[in-house]
Amino acid sequence: VLKEFLESEGHNVEMREDSRALTDGTLRGKDALVFNTLREGEMVLSADEQESMKTFISDGKGFICIHISGCVPDSWSEYADITGGGWVMGESFHPPYGKFQVDIQDSNHICAGGLESFETEDELYMNIEYRDQGNDVFVSADFDGGTFGKNREGAEDMHMPGGTFPLAWTRNYGNGKVFVTLLGHDGKSHQSAGFQKLVLNGIDWVTG
């Protein structure tokens, strides 16, 4: 779905499912790198791949980080310097997948053009690692709080606090631009017109 709507807006997209693309020359001539997958555990980037990614972005290219791809690996905490934060295994959580309203909290943000608050079906990430310094948040969601049962036998119910939770921000890494959204769990959430406009705005900014 992601590739389809990006191409429908005129973007030339090369999709790879292996991280060797970071070191095999694939990035040569590209304007931006998009992550849409977990990079923790067995899928963590090698040291060479990490360095190649850092160089690509810091030299002035763009990086778009979607949903779980912002997960901060235990073995590479520096990743959060690039993204400004994201999911942390064993610490972050979310209410059950479902509908909620996404709010544009800063309509003057460079990536907010043409965006209005919208309803989506997705995961609302909470208790993420978050770097206040350098992050320019412009999308969020409110949650009233609640208690939910875990999806495995013997697990205790979990209370999730109410509050306002960041869902998209921009930042810089070296000379490069970084756009992060915590939305985008699955194909259904990617079909949301609001989500698509959000990502397209982010790509236009990081490549501009």
Task: Label the model's feature ranges.
Residues R16-T23, D48-E51, G162-A168:
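Alpha-helical scaffolding within the catalytic cores
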Residues V1-K30:
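Aromatic-Pro/Gly-enriched surface loop or interdomain linker
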Residues L2, T26, E49-S52, S75, ...:
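Stable alpha-helical elements in mature extracytoplasmic
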Residues L27-D74, N175:
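Short alpha-beta junction capping motif
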